[in-house]
Design a protein with these regions (language model features):
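Secondary-structure boundary/capping micro-motif
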Residues: 1-284, 288-289, 295-299, 303-305, ...
Length: 350
C-alpha cells in the first residue's frame, strides 16, 4: 500500500480513486481491468524492485550516525571521559550515572574518535591486538555462469559415460602451504599438488606444470581430466588455467559445487579420511616437498579396497589409464606389506 505508484494513461477519464483500491491489496496489479479501456480510474501499481530499494535505503539511513541528540551525546561524552580519566571503567561509569548507552557503543565511539579520550586511556583496551579481518577468496559469481552444479548434472546426463575428477584443497597451517587434491571418482584414485599458498595464481602455475609433465608423456591434460568438479575456493577462480590446454584451446570442463555444499563432491571428501588418518588436522606442510606428497598418496592409493574386490586404487588406475600416467602424476607402486596408514609414514619424509 505504501509503495504503490499512481499511473495515468489514455484510458484515464477521472481523478477519483477506484473503489477497489479502498480494500486489499490496494493496488491494480491483479485487477483484470488493469489494461482495459473500460476502466476510467488512475492505476495504482506496485513495483517490487522499487519497494525493495526504498526499504534498503531506509534500513541503511536508520543505522547511520549516532542515535542520540546533540545535547545527549555531549553530556554522555563528558561523563564517560571524566569517569575514565578518574580511573573508573566504562561499565561502572554507565551504570553509576544511569546513562542510556551501551558499553559496546561507547567503545565504538572511542574507536571512531568521537570522544576526547582515546584507547590509550583504557588500560585493558590498549593491550588488545586488533582482530584479524581477513576474508577468504571465493570464485566470483560471473565465473560460475555455465559452470554451476546444475550445469554439471545436465552435462553428465548428456554424457553419461564420461569420467570426472573431484578437486579440493587440504589446509595445513593457516597461511602456509596447502595441498590441492584430485580424486578420480571411477577408480577412487587420489593424488595431490603442493601449493606454496592458497591463491589462484599458485594453483594455475602448478596446473600448468602438470600439463607440461603429461605432455612429456605424450598425453593431453583433457584426455585424463575431461571434467573437473570443485568447490568455491578462490584458488580455483582462474578457470581458463584448468580448462585450456597448453595451446590455449579448451580441452576440459570445469564446474563448481553450490556454496557450502561439500556433499556434492562426496568422493574426495571421503577419501580425505585416509589422508587425515596419517596427517592430523593443523599439521604444517611448510617443510614438505612434492616428493613427500607423492609418497603419502602412493601409500593411500595402495590400500586394498572392498569395492574393488581386494584391488587397490593404484591397481584400478593403472588398469583403466596406464602406469605411465600414474608416474606422471607422481604416484608409484607400494607393495601391500609395506603400506603404512598411520603418522609413522611421516617419519620417512626426508
Amino acid at each position: 500500500k505504501l509503495h504503490g505508484k499512481v499511473h495515468t494513461n489514455g484510458f484515464t477519464k477521472t481523478d477519483e480513486c477506484c473503489p477497489r483500491l479502498l480494500k486489499a491489496p490496494f493496488v491494480c496489479n491483479g485487477c483484470p481491468k488493469r489494461n482495459h479501456s473500460n476502466c476510467p480510474y488512475p492505476r495504482r501499481i506496485y513495483h517490487a524492485k522499487t519497494a525493495q530499494q526504498e526499504y534498503e535505503s531506509v534500513l541503511v539511513e536508520s543505522r547511520e550516525g549516532i542515535p542520540l541528540t546533540k545535547e545527549e551525546f555531549y553530556k554522555t561524552e563528558a561523563i564517560i571521559s571524566s569517569a575514565v580519566k578518574s580511573g573508573q571503567n566504562i561499565y561502572h561509569a554507565i551504570k553509576a550515572n544511569d546513562l542510556s548507552v551501551s558499553k559496546t557503543t561507547v567503545y565504538r565511539h572511542i574507536e571512531c574518535g568521537y570522544y576526547t579520550i582515546s584507547k590509550i586511556d583504557l588500560p585493558r583496551a590498549a593491550k588488545f591486538k586488533p582482530r584479524k579481518g581477513q576474508k577468504g577468496e571465493y570464485v566470483p559469481k560471473g565465473v560460475k555462469i555455465g559452470r554451476s552444479f546444475e550445469d554439471f548434472m545436465l552435462y553428465l546426463e548428456e554424457n553419461p559415460s564420461i569420467n570426472y575428477v573431484e578437486m579440493d584443497t587440504v589446509i595445513g597451517r593457516i597461511g602456509g602451504k596447502v595441498i590441492m587434491t584430485f580424486q578420480f571418482v571411477n577408480v577412487d584414485f587420489m593424488f595431490g599438488l603442493l601449493l606454496d599458498n592458497k591463491t589462484a595464481a599458485e594453483a594455475a602455475e602448478k596446473i600448468r606444470e602438470l600439463k607440461e609433465r603429461l605432455c612429456a608423456f605424450g598425453v593431453k591434460f583433457g584426455d585424463v581430466f575431461p571434467v573437473l568438479l570443485t568447490d568455491n575456493g578462490g584458488e580455483f577462480s582462474d578457470v581458463f588455467a584448468f580448462e585450456n590446454g597448453l595451446d590455449e584451446e579448451p580441452e576440459t570442463k570445469l564446474f563448481f559445487c553450490d556454496p557450502n555444499a561439500p556433499y556434492q563432491k562426496p568422493h574426495v571428501e571421503n577419501n580425505h579420511t585416509l589422508f587425515r588418518g596419517i596427517v592430523g588436522t593443523g599439521t604444517s606442510f611448510d617443510d614438505w616437498s612434492q616428493e613427500n606428497v607423492n609418497l603419502l598418496f602412493s601409500h593411500i592409493n595402495a590400500v586394498k579396497r572392498k569395492q574393488f574386490n581386494g584391488k587397490s586404487a593404484y591397481d584400478m588406475f593403472t588398469f583403466a589409464y596406464s602406469k605411465e600416467i600414474a608416474d606422471a602424476l607422481g604416484i608409484s607402486f607400494v607393495a601391500p606389506k609395506d603400506v603404512i596408514q598411520t603418522s609413522k609414514l611421516l617419519k620417512l619424509f626426508s
